């Protein structure tokens, strides 16, 4: 409803509308926390050896960062297995590499170079899809049947698909 209220029924979503859609922004952050684009980030330890709590990380070591586990850590996210976009209303967290509890695109010098474009395109695309389609489950599928669990692989796929129905002929 937020999108149709802000944008209106007879207009298309524009980039300037995105800043007026806080719930959409929260849904996208929560989606990236709950279903990151990939489960891991790979980094290489530059510089000298590093010791953390009596564990030595050697220079040039490959480091695997489990961003899926960070997004499901109850010490960081209350009710981590629950999809709750509202958690971002009172929490200043972005996914642009500044907050390490939400780093789906990496951080620092190795952050995804396409992030500025992806940020705009994801918001604009999701807002346009919500604005222009009514979303419904396939016949015979109830909301209780929807399983948001992933199947592990190079990409994370949803187990039960949704059907997009155009709102305008």
Task: Place the predicted regions along the sequence by residue.
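Hydrophobic, well-ordered secondary-structure elements that form the walls
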Residues: 31, 57-60, 83, 108, ...
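Juxtamembrane membrane-interface segments of multi-pass membrane proteins
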Residues: 1-10
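Hydrophobic, repeat-rich solenoid/adaptor surfaces of innate immune receptors and signaling proteins
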Residues: 61, 66-67, 122, 126, ...
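Conserved cytochrome P450 K-helix E-x-x-R motif and the immediately C-terminal K′/meander segment
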Residues: 11-55, 74
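Cytochrome P450 heme-binding "Cys pocket" and the immediately downstream C-terminal segment
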Residues: 115-154
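Cytochrome P450 heme-thiolate "Cys pocket" and heme-binding signature region
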Residues: 90-121, 147-151
């Amino acid at each position: 409803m937020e999108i149709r209220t802000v944008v209106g029924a007879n207009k298309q979503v524009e980039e300037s509308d995105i800043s007026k859609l806080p719930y959409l922004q929260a849904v996208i952050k929560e989606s990236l926390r709950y279903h990151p684009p990939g489960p891991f980030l790979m980094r290489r330890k530059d510089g000298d050896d590093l010791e953390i709590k009596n564990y030595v990380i050697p220079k040039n070591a490959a480091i695997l960062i489990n961003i899926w586990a960070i997004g499901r850590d109850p010490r960081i996210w209350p009710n981590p297995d629950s999809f709750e976009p509202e958690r971002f209303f009172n929490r200043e967290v972005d996914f642009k590499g500044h907050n390490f509890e939400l780093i789906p695109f990496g951080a620092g010098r190795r952050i995804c170079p396409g992030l500025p474009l992806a940020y705009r395109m994801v918001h604009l695309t999701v807002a346009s899809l919500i604005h222009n389609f009514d979303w419904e489950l396939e016949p015979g599928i109830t909301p209780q049947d929807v399983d948001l669990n992933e199947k592990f692989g190079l990409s994370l796929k949803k187990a039960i698909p949704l059907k997009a129905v155009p709102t305008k002929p």
